[in-house]
């Protein structure tokens, strides 16, 4: 997929996963690539492990609203599998879901009152929506890079393969957003995410 006149992103995760940092980097990348960009965030109970949702829109013309409607997302970037299922309806036909393989088990599941949905649910949702599903082992790749907290940058690396924006632009924007002492870690994490969907 390459950016047409407009590219819509929905990023979803759980508090503490770096969803908002990822959306800020994605917005910076769009601006650096010459797009008009709008972004919105819903923090929910982010500090307590609740859902975090961010919408980002790139457009070659003006973006008038940051909100991505249901069925309009070109890319759904999910930092956790159940969050991917909860927000799958935002994906449009021909879109791509980039999903971290991480599972954060909610209390209802750990208490035995519900079952955590398996990967087949994600695959079926993607097929039903006419979308593509890319599963990425974000935590494993981030750990191999040096720190599990870099999983958000691993996932951005995977997303970068879908877009016609140079790797140098991505890295420049990442470098502007992360502390200098973590630059090498994040370079490695980004490269491993790109390689995961090559």
Please describe what each predicted stretch is.
Residues 1-198:
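Active-site cofactor/cluster-binding pocket
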């Amino acid at each position: 997929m390459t950016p047409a006149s407009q590219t819509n992103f929905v990023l979803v995760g759980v508090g503490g996963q770096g969803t908002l940092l990822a959306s800020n980097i994605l917005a910076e990348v769009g601006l650096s690539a010459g797009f008009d960009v709008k972004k919105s965030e819903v923090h929910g109970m982010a500090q307590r492990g609740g859902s975090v949702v961010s919408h980002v829109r790139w457009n070659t013309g003006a973006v008038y609203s940051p909100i991505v409607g249901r069925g309009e997302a070109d890319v759904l970037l999910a930092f956790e599998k159940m969050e991917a299922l909860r927000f799958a309806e935002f994906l449009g036909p021909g879109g791509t879901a980039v999903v971290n393989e991480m599972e954060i088990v909610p209390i209802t599941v750990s208490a035995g009152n519900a079952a955590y949905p398996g990967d087949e649910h994600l695959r079926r949702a993607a097929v039903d929506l006419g979308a593509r599903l890319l599963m990425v082992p974000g935590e494993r790749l981030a750990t191999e890079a040096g720190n599990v907290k870099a999983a958000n940058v691993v996932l951005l690396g995977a997303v970068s393969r879908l877009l016609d924006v140079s790797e140098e632009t991505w890295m420049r924007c990442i470098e502007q957003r992360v502390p200098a002492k973590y630059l090498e870690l994040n370079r490695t994490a980004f490269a491993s995410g790109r390689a995961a969907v090559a």
